[in-house]
């Protein structure tokens, strides 16, 4: 962990902000907010803001710890070589301390300001990503994304629990939806950046099992994801606005996955089907969870 580029201080606020992986944090904040808004019951706006802020800060802390640990790996990958640590714009101690400060502070404030059950789940999600996934799973098994996907699946559960104070079937389903969504989302990316992973010795699925196996698994997870997203509708946890949206969104997801999963040879097309699936998978999750909130609003207003 000591071969990252030499230090080039001072690091400015943009480097610290980059450590939090703001693009990833956007999705984390959004799904956490959707879990909070879709939950039954009411919550004071200040407490709601505190909950979402803590989710965001906790995710940022976990991301900073991830980059602290993986600085050498990031230096060897084209996609990540310009991050603050491998680019030499920040020292590792600063990144580590920043990550621990964000992580610890977010859990403490969540516990005092929102509730300790939400704080415990937040703490576990940070530990899950920064240790279980980053340190233990990612360098050891091609199933790292499958098992490690739980780290990114907690925000809607935390948002829901911030309102209700307990864990019921619905927040568990929201967790499972993101858990099942993660492999096809990330493996689509891994297919077109697999040479980077191979170069630094990370056993991502395309590197270890090959493209053909990865494509089959992308299709399998996408097919399983579709009925899972409909379960909230079937059990009455969400209404028709969400249900029909989930069905249409899921069918498009499967259709794009079929194009990726059934490809036996890859022509010189820049892996466009894989890139389309990856791009759509991000849009899919935003719209799916957005429609969950829209469904809740329609129910409250008596529109369904």
From Swiss-Prot:
Stated family: Belongs to the UbiA prenyltransferase family. Protoheme IX farnesyltransferase subfamily.
GO cellular component, as recorded: plasma membrane
PROSITE patterns membership: UBIA
Reactions that this protein is recorded to catalyse: heme b + (2E,6E)-farnesyl diphosphate + H2O = Fe(II)-heme o + diphosphate
Membrane-related topology note: Multi-pass membrane protein
Pathway assigned in UniProt: Porphyrin-containing compound metabolism; heme O biosynthesis; heme O from protoheme: step 1/1
Keywords: Cell inner membrane, Cell membrane, Heme biosynthesis, Membrane, Transferase, Transmembrane, Transmembrane helix
Gene: ctaB
Name the UniProt record assigns to this protein: Protoheme IX farnesyltransferase
CDD domains cross-referenced by the UniProt entry: PT_UbiA_Cox10
Listed Gene3D superfamilies: UbiA prenyltransferase (1.10.357.140)
Compartments (UniProt record): Cell inner membrane
PANTHER family xref list: 4-HYDROXYBENZOATE SOLANESYLTRANSFERASE (PTHR43448:SF7), PROTOHEME IX FARNESYLTRANSFERASE, MITOCHONDRIAL (PTHR43448)
One Gene Ontology biological process: heme O biosynthetic process
KW Transmembrane helix (keyword) present: yes
Pfam family, one: UbiA
Function of the molecule: Converts heme B (protoheme IX) to heme O by substitution of the vinyl group on carbon 2 of heme B porphyrin ring with a hydroxyethyl farnesyl side group.
């Amino acid at each position: 962990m000591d071969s990252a580029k030499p230090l080039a201080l001072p690091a400015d606020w943009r480097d610290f902000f980059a450590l939090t992986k703001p693009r990833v944090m956007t999705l984390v904040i959004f799904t956490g907010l959707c879990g909070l808004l879709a939950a039954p019951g009411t919550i004071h706006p200040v407490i709601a803001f505190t909950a979402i802020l803590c989710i965001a800060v906790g995710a940022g802390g976990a991301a900073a710890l991830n980059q602290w640990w993986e600085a050498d790996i990031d230096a060897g990958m084209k996609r990540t070589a310009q991050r603050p640590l491998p680019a030499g714009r920040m020292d590792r101690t600063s990144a580590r301390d920043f990550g621990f400060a964000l992580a610890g502070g977010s859990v403490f404030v969540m516990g005092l300001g929102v509730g300790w059950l939400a704080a415990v789940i937040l703490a576990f999600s940070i530990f899950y990503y920064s240790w279980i996934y980053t340190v233990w799973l990612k360098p050891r098994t091609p199933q790292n994304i499958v098992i490690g996907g739980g780290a990114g699946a907690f925000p809607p559960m935390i948002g829901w629990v911030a309102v209700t104070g307990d864990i019921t079937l619905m927040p568990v389903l929201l967790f499972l939806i993101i858990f099942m969504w993660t492999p096809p989302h990330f493996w689509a990316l891994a297919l077109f950046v697999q040479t980077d992973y191979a170069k630094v010795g990370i056993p991502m699925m395309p590197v270890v099992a090959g493209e053909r196996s990865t494509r089959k698994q992308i299709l399998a997870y996408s097919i399983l994801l579709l009925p899972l997203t409909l379960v909230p509708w079937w059990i009455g946890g969400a209404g028709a606005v969400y249900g029909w949206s989930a069905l249409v969104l899921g069918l498009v997801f499967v259709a794009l996955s079929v194009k990726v999963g059934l490809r036996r040879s890859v022509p010189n097309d820049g892996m466009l089907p894989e890139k389309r699936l990856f791009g759509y998978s991000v849009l899919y999750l935003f719209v799916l969870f957005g429609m969950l909130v829209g469904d809740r609003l329609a129910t409250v207003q008596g529109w369904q």
